[in-house]
Amino acid sequence: TIGAIEDAIEKAEPDFSVRRGFTSQIIIDHVKKRDDVTIDNVTEALDRAVNNGVKTLVVQPTHLMNGLEYTDLVNEIAENADSFEKVVVGEPLLTSDDDFKAVIQAITDATKEYDDGETAICFMGHGTEADSNQVYAKMQDMLTEEGFEHYYVGTVEAEPSLDDVIAKVKEGEYKKVVLEPLMIVAGD
């Protein structure tokens, strides 16, 4: 969850205050309606940082890839960079080959109990219309290359679709299917 990520950052960087801002107004509105919790959007979070006298702004997005929301975030931060002495923006989770390898290690370690040859292990991400959607195909290719032949990667909103994953699973003679998220938040 986002809260667990924030807690880990606070522990790792105790000299910094951790604050939350979401890029999706749809999610902000949903959380407000469901939980009556107000979350800043990017503009509000940046304004709050300026008003609080923040000198060094460090932004660590929880995006999986360099998609449209990440690009919009980077652009908005750049427009406001003069309001701070220093601005640092982290990269999304799946940026370098080493990132992919680390995620593959984490997800296969977390699901190894299911990897019995009779179970298809499927990970679903959000997906995007942007070129960055290729991270899902790359993840699938790397899983296959590393011998994880019972692992499948798909997306909710793009390619490979759920139907694509189901078709691949049907090609095997699996007795069970395990479905896991490849996302931080559920989205809209």
For the regions a language model picked out, list residue spans one by one.
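Active-site-proximal alpha-helix that buttresses catalytic centers in soluble enzyme cores
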Residues: 1-188
